[in-house]
Design a protein with these regions (language model features):
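Histidine-rich, glycine-flanked metal-binding segment
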Residues: 1-4, 9-56
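Short helix-capping segments at alpha-helix termini
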Residues: 38, 114-119
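Generic structural signal for residues in well-ordered beta-strands
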Residues: 45, 121-123
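Metal-associated gating/positioning segment near the N- to mid-region
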Residues: 51-116
C-alpha cells in the first residue's frame, strides 16, 4: 500500500519545511519539500495540513519492569503506549526481578520483547 501524507510540516535533518511524505509498504519512500509533482491514483491520501511529521523518537531510558514486576508495567503495554506517542525504539533498564545482569537473563528478556514489543527495542 502507498500512502501520501500531504501538506504537513516536516521536521527532519535539522530542517523544518512544508511538504509531502510518500510511504510504500510501511517504509518512507520519499520526502518532498513542497508538493508531489504528480499524485498517482493508487495512493491513500492523508491531509496533514496543520500537523507535524517527525522522525520516530528513541526513548533511551524506559522501565517496563518485565520480568518480575509486571504489576507495574510490561513490554507489551509499555511499547504500545510508546508507539502511540511517536516512539519507534526504546532502551529498557535492567531494574527487574531478577535483574538482567547475565547473558542468559538478557536472552530471556530479548525473547519476551521479540514476542510482545510493538516497536524496536534494546537492553
Amino acid at each position: 500500500m502507498r500512502i501520501l501524507l500531504q501538506s504537513g510540516t516536516i521536521i527532519n535533518e535539522g530542517r523544518i519545511f512544508k511538504g509531502d511524505l510518500l510511504i510504500h509498504n510501511d517504509r518512507i519512500e520519499k520526502i518532498i519539500e513542497g508538493k508531489l509533482d504528480s499524485v498517482p491514483g493508487d495512493l491513500k491520501i492523508i491531509d496533514a495540513t496543520g500537523k507535524y511529521i517527525i522522525p520516530g523518537v528513541i526513548d533511551d531510558q524506559v522501565h517496563f519492569r518485565e520480568p518480575g514486576l509486571t504489576h507495574k508495567g510490561d513490554i507489551r503495554e509499555g511499547s504500545r503506549a510508546a508507539a502511540a506517542g511517536g516512539v519507534t525504539s526504546f532502551m529498557d533498564m535492567p531494574n527487574v526481578k531478577p535483574p538482567t545482569i547475565t547473558n542468559e537473563l538478557l536472552r530471556e528478556k530479548q525473547q519476551i520483547a521479540k514476542e510482545n514489543s510493538a516497536v524496536n527495542y534494546s537492553f
